[in-house]
Amino acid sequence: MKKLLFLLLALICMSTTASAAKVICGDERTDVWVPMLRGKKVCLLTNYTATINGKHLIDVMLEKGINLVAIATPEHGLSGKASAGAKIASSTYKDTGIPVWSLYGKTRRMTSEQAAQFDVLVFDIQDVGVRFFTYYVTMLYTFDALADQGKRLIVFDRPNPNGMYVDGPILEEKHKSFVGGLPIPVVHGLTMGELAQMAVGEGWVTKVDVEVVCCQNYTHQTRYQLPVKPGPNVRTMQAVYLYPSTCLIEGTVFSEARGTDFGFEAYGHPDIAPTGFSYTPRSIEGAKNPKHQDKLCHGVDLRKVPKNQILKEGFTVKYVIDAYNRYGKGEELFAGNRKHFFHRLVGVDYIYEMIIAGKSADEIKAMWRDEVEKFKVLRRKYLLYEE
């Protein structure tokens, strides 16, 4: 019966796609979700990306008379201004008295006591479709509490800007962490609604009733332009497309250009030979105390790499290999706790080992090709939109 309901939902979602029409996100479909939420006590898991024509979903819900009893927020907070990894305190929303629960503070999991205070949890956050982008993990970390209290999740779905392809190694269980919550490729090609249903369907998380308010006029080949930046250091579509590969620089001693206005669109280090391009990371909003703060970094500028080329190439370790060669100090590229974090990002051991052994990016990419093809078949069961 549940398989039949999922198939029906998928057919409904797919029937609303049209490549030429404007994409309509789930939260814009007030005619669908207002009746679903009317008379319910609602908790909204969200951040600054949940806007409808410039107005935040929180305010739209209140205007529509929805009984919003709590707001929960992920990494970077409701405003999106907190730096990566910075703990965020709980607060209240404006002058409404509605509590804002930080799920990136003393705890990263919703408690059963919190879940007891509402009837339904709504999730609406713009993601980038990458395994180490943490918003989906925050969503999954609510499932235990929801299941304990018998509460359901409604996802107001949004397009995946990297949803056109699937690439990268499958996360190994021993490397599971907050930057890798599921056994999926680095670029998984799923929307948050699809991913939530896959996680439940495959038994990867505690079973929760998940409903999805689908996007309209969207397919997985839609080149969706994000109306707002999805993170404080992912500011442009160039950064969104580069992020799956350049985020690996975080697992090295090189700068990933945090502390500039082109984060993840460049990388560099103070101690390599001049390259003709340099930048100086500064402590700025959303990037407090970046690597090599106030030091001139020589490096590589990726801002003019054609977007079609980035997408065609997919997930690659070539930037880490380039940093390794430019640095010239072998394993010191991963000094301190960087090696451990690099393993968490890539989700496997062999990438590090092959880089040290001098293997090429193409040789390394060949290692995950077969498992990605198998994942694509599994993924297809949960697609709500045409491929």
Descriptions of predicted regions:
Residues M1-K22:
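Bacterial Sec-dependent N-terminal signal peptides
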Residues V69-E75, F156:
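Short internal beta-strands
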Residues G80-G85, I154-K176:
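Glycine-rich, charge-decorated loop segments at or immediately adjacent to ligand/cofactor-binding or catalytic sites
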Residues A89-Q117, V130:
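Glycine-rich oxoanion-binding loops at beta->alpha junctions
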Residues D127-M139:
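Glycine/threonine-rich flexible loop motifs
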Residues H175-T246:
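Conserved anion/nucleotide-ligand pocket segment
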Residues N217-K295:
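Glycine-rich, aromatic-lined ligand/substrate-binding cores of catalytic
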Residues G263, G268-R369, E387:
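Conserved functional hotspot residues or short segments at active or partner-binding sites
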